[in-house]
Design a protein with these regions (language model features):
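Conserved phosphate/anionic-ligand binding catalytic regions in large, soluble enzymes, centered on
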Residues: 8-11, 58, 62-63, 225-227, ...
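Glycine-rich phosphate-binding loops that contact phosphosugars or nucleotide phosphates
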Residues: 32-34, 41-187, 218, 253, ...
Length: 365
C-alpha cells in the first residue's frame, strides 16, 4: 500500500475530507482551542491581530464576521506578515498577536515571528505543522487541527482554520451555545460541496473558458470571495481579482464584456438584496455570471447554486468555501492549467516564499 507521501493526492481528495475533519474538530473544540485561550492569560484581550497571508489570510477573513459577533468589545484585525513586519510590528499591552502559517515554512510568517521576539514579546504561531521550521521562531506553537495536506493549493487547511478561529472566539467570548451554529454551517458546507458537481456540469463550457474571473461579495462573504479569487488565479492561471459588491460597480465593472466570468456570493444578510441586484445586472453583460445564495427563489436557475439556509449570515464564507475550491479544482484539472511557466523557477530562486525545508508534492513546476 502506498504511503501518504507516495500517493498522488489532489485538491479534490482534501475537499472531500474536509466535512469529516471539520466535524471531528468541532467535537474537539475544547482540546484544540485550549492552547490559544491559555495565551490570553485568563482574560479577554482588548485587541486581537491575526497575521497571515494567502489562503490563511482568507481563512481569517472567513472567520472574522463570526469572531466579531462573539467578541463585540474586542478589536479584531487581519493583517499580512509584510505589513506587520515592515509597518506595524509593535505589540501593545493587552493585545493578542498570532502569526498563521499552515506549512510553518512561509518566510514572511517566520519574519513576523522574529519581529515579535525582537520586542521580547511572546511569539505565537498557529500552524498545521508543529514540527516545521516555525518552531524555531515561535515561543508557542498551536496546531489548529488540519492534519496532513500535501497539495500546495490548500483547501482543508482553509476550512479547518476558519472553523478553529470561530471555535476560539465562541469559547473566549463565553458563547459556547453558538457551537451548534458551527455544526449547522459544516452541514451546509457539505451540501454545497455535493451540489457543486452538478453546478459545474451544467455550466461546464463557461467554466472551462474563463479568461478573466471576478469574485464579488459583501463583507459577510468577503472571505470566500478572496479565497475564490486566489484559488482560480493559482490553478486556472487567469487574472482573478476579488471586489466588495459596491466597489465592483464603482469602476471595475466598466471593463466587463461577454467574455468575463463573475462569481457573486450572497451572505443572506442586509446586503443580500443589493448583491442579488448587481448579479442580475452583470448577467445583462455576461452569460458567465454566477451566484451562490440561500435565496430559494433562485431554485431552478442553472447559473445559481442555492445553498441551505444558514444558522447566521456570519457563517456564509465557511459554508460556501467548497464551491470555490471545487470550481478551481475541476476547471484546472480538466484544463491541465496549474503547470507553472518554467521561468518561475528563476523567480523563486531570487525571491522565495518558502524555506528550503519546503517539498513541492504538486509536480506543477
Amino acid at each position: 500500500m502506498a504511503t501518504v507521501e507516495e500517493r498522488v493526492w489532489t485538491m479534490g481528495d482534501y475537499i472531500e475530507e474536509s466535512p469529516r475533519v471539520a466535524r471531528e474538530n468541532l467535537a474537539r473544540a475544547d482540546e484544540l482551542t485550549a492552547p490559544l485561550i491559555a495565551c490570553c492569560d485568563g482574560g479577554v484581550p482588548t485587541r486581537i491581530r491575526l497575521v497571515a497571508s494567502g489562503s490563511s489570510y482568507n481563512a481569517c477573513q472567513c472567520a472574522l464576521p463570526f469572531m466579531e459577533s462573539c467578541l463585540p468589545d474586542v478589536q479584531i484585525r487581519v493583517v499580512t506578515p509584510h505589513r506587520f513586519a515592515y509597518y506595524e510590528p509593535a505589540v501593545a499591552a493587552g493585545e493578542l498577536v498570532a502569526v498563521v502559517t499552515q506549512s510553518g515554512l512561509s518566510t514572511n510568517a517566520l519574519e513576523a515571528l522574529d519581529a515579535i521576539r525582537a520586542q521580547d514579546r511572546r511569539a505565537i504561531c498557529l500552524t498545521g505543522n508543529v514540527a516545521s521550521d516555525a518552531r524555531e521562531h515561535a515561543d508557542v506553537v498551536v496546531d489548529w487541527g488540519v492534519g496532513v495536506e500535501l497539495v500546495g493549493y490548500v483547501t482543508k487547511g482553509v476550512t479547518t482554520l476558519a472553523l478553529f478561529l470561530m471555535m476560539f472566539a465562541a469559547k473566549l467570548g463565553a458563547h459556547e451555545d453558538r457551537l451548534g451554529e458551527l455544526s449547522g454551517a459544516i452541514d451546509a458546507a457539505d451540501a454545497v460541496r455535493a451540489a457543486t458537481y452538478g453546478f459545474f456540469e451544467r455550466n461546464e463550457k463557461a467554466l472551462l473558458s474563463m479568461a478573466v474571473s471576478y469574485c464579488v461579495a459583501p463583507f459577510g462573504a468577503r472571505g470566500v470571495a478572496l479565497e475564490g479569487a486566489l484559488k482560480i488565479g493559482e490553478t486556472v492561471h487567469v487574472p482573478s481579482p476579488a471586489y466588495e459588491v459596491e466597489e465592483f460597480i464603482h469602476g471595475p465593472n466598466l471593463q466587463l464584456t461577454p467574455g468575463y466570468t463573475l462569481f457573486f456570493f450572497d451572505a443572506g444578510d442586509a446586503a443580500g438584496e443589493r448583491t442579488r441586484l448587481v448579479y442580475r445586472a452583470a448577467r445583462e453583460v455576461s452569460d458567465a455570471a454566477f451566484l451562490v445564495t440561500t435565496d430559494a427563489s433562485f431554485a431552478g436557475d442553472p447559473h445559481v447554486l442555492v445553498a441551505p439556509e444558514l444558522p447566521s449570515w456570519e457563517l456564509a464564507s465557511l459554508a460556501y468555501l467548497p464551491f470555490v475550491q471545487l470550481v478551481a479544482h475541476l476547471a484546472s484539472s480538466a484544463l491541465g492549467s496549474s503547470k507553472q511557466h518554467p521561468l518561475l523557477k528563476r523567480f523563486k530562486a531570487i525571491a522565495a516564499a518558502k524555506t528550503e525545508s519546503f517539498v513541492n508534492y504538486d509536480g506543477d513546476e
